[in-house]
Amino acid sequence: MTDKLTSLRQITTVVADTGDIAAMKLYQPQDATTNPSIILNAAQIPEYRKLIDEAIAWAREQSSDHAQQIVDATDKLAVNIGLEILKLIPGRISTEVDARLSYDTVASVAKAKRLIKLYNEAGISNDRILIKLASTWQGIRAAEQLEKEGINCNLTLLFSFAQARACAEAGVFLISPFVGRILDWYKANGDQKEFAPSEDPGVVSVTEIYQYYKKHGYKTVVMGASFRNLGEIIELAGCDRLTIAPSLLKELAESEGPVERKLAYTGEIQAKPAPLTEAEFYWQHNQDPMAVDKLADGIRKFAIDQGKLEKMISDLL
């Protein structure tokens, strides 16, 4: 009998949410996603030590200023890890812009171009890279500009419908709505502690976004992310892409049986509404206390891990 991972692959593009080379070799995903937390964890893997040493040596050649060396080395390390992953996957690697730039459009664009330049210099073309940006108004504007310049983006930390709508209207390549973190918030802040997969607030959110995009003919790819259990993944089968951590990829591979398509849009394509203004975006996003909390919390957590990574690099310089 076919395992659930193989069955899921027939209807959804499976992406690995990890920087672990061993997991890539084992589960053979189409694409891979990284973030500051994943890069920090990957930096602890012994096989990656040479990538850290190379990044530090390179940074020393670029500048004699210690602070600049830290920035250069962390950028180079993220790209070095991405390059290793690209050897093992046929598709794209997502590399994230520093979360501390989440409210700065100009700086986000500059950092994105810096990362792209490092990939290009290593022989990797833009069509194998996605630049990850937080789905703030400023991050979405940065992505809009980058897309026009041929740099595809993955808009992450997406929790509200307003964020999803603004991303589609900006013409971004892909969004990563966070399923599990939405569930976490409702469990922590509501009376209900258990949800059937079809009623899981994260699943409901991604389903609504998927249907809206397809109904209005938006090309933006919907990639569900941040899963807490197998039920969430199975309930979103048919989503354009799903990025899944190795522990859940393992569970899928070890579970037998078919996976049925749950997401599909069969209706007619309808006219797109007028794009959200900045004021409308903030007002609508602000009406969702979960999204406000989780976006801010996600940016803070990624920034903390970026700081830890820089401290590790600084100590080695």
Swiss-Prot record:
Pfam families in alphabetical order: TAL_FSA
Function: Transaldolase is important for the balance of metabolites in the pentose-phosphate pathway.
Cytoplasm in keyword set: yes
BP GO annotations: carbohydrate metabolic process; pentose-phosphate shunt, non-oxidative branch
Swiss-Prot/TrEMBL keywords: Cytoplasm, Pentose shunt, Schiff base, Transferase
Self-association and partners: Homodimer.
Protein name: Transaldolase
GO terms for MF: transaldolase activity
Compartments it resides in: Cytoplasm
HAMAP family noted in UniProt: Transaldolase_1
Pathway: Carbohydrate degradation; pentose phosphate pathway; D-glyceraldehyde 3-phosphate and beta-D-fructose 6-phosphate from D-ribose 5-phosphate and D-xylulose 5-phosphate (non-oxidative stage): step 2/3
InterPro entries linked to this entry: Aldolase_TIM, TAL/FSA, Transaldolase_1, Transaldolase_AS
GO cellular component, one term: cytosol
Family: Belongs to the transaldolase family. Type 1 subfamily.
Catalytic activities: D-sedoheptulose 7-phosphate + D-glyceraldehyde 3-phosphate = D-erythrose 4-phosphate + beta-D-fructose 6-phosphate
Lineage start: Bacteria, Pseudomonadati, Pseudomonadota, Gammaproteobacteria, Enterobacterales
E.C. code: 2.2.1.2
